[in-house]
Each structure stands twice: as structure tokens, then as C-alpha cells.
Regions:
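Two-component system phosphorelay core
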Residues: 1-56, 60-62, 66-115
Length: 115
């Protein structure tokens, strides 16, 4: 996290995209769409305890989250998989869903600043 309380780390991405603002903007627009879809899928499939579709959503966002050093997303996703496997109570699933909703919303806001 940098001094502005941002959670997205664009430094690696900037290097990969040759520090080209147009490329970064294009990537950010696509990532906004990906994180919006993931945020919705995460909550839906977690609360339904639909492990198959939950894992598909996680695998789809994982490379983007890694590129942006978003370990908190990866960690919460792994935690939520355990909640499903261990058949934890719904309130724990809801807490994870709400946490991921907040994280993804902040990520989307930060990405939109780059568009």
C-alpha cells in the first residue's frame, strides 16, 4: 500500500506496459470490468456454496490480481474456499463476501483513476 492508501500497485504493470499511459488506461478499463464481474460472482457463488463456479471466478481474476500485487484479494479468496470446504456458517460467508466487495470496490475506484 502506498502513501495515498491505495491498494493497487501499478509499478510492475507500468514496467510490463512500457510506462505507456494509453496501454495502462486500456488495461485498467479491462480490469475494471474483470473486477466488477469477480465482485458479483464471488458473493453469489460463495453464498450459494457453489464451489465449482466460485473456483472458476477465482481462477479468472488471479492473474490480474497478481499483476497488481493484490495479495489481500488472493488471501481472502483462499480463506473463502476453506469456508466452503469446512461448511462454515452463513454469517462467515457473508463476512467474507462483504470484505471482498469492499476490496474490489476500492480496486475498481483506483483503476478508474487510470482510465
Amino acid at each position: 500500500m502506498n502513501e495515498n492508501n491505495h491498494i493497487v500497485d501499478f509499478s510492475g504493470l507500468s514496467e510490463i506496459l512500457y510506462q505507456n499511459d494509453d496501454f495502462i488506461s486500456e488495461f485498467s478499463a479491462a480490469a475494471v470490468e474483470s473486477f466488477s464481474e469477480f465482485r458479483d460472482s464471488y458473493g453469489k457463488y460463495l453464498l450459494e456454496r457453489d464451489e465449482t463456479n466460485f473456483r472458476k471466478a477465482g481462477h479468472k481474476i488471479k492473474p490480474v490480481a497478481q499483476m497488481l500485487s493484490l495479495t489481500m484479494i488472493l488471501d481472502e479468496y483462499e480463506h473463502a474456499k476453506k469456508l466452503i470446504w469446512e461448511e462454515k456458517p452463513e454469517k462467515e460467508l457473508k463476512a467474507s463476501s462483504e470484505k471482498m466487495e469492499k476490496i474490489c470496490s476500492q480496486v475498481i475506484t483506483e483503476l478508474e483513476e487510470k482510465i
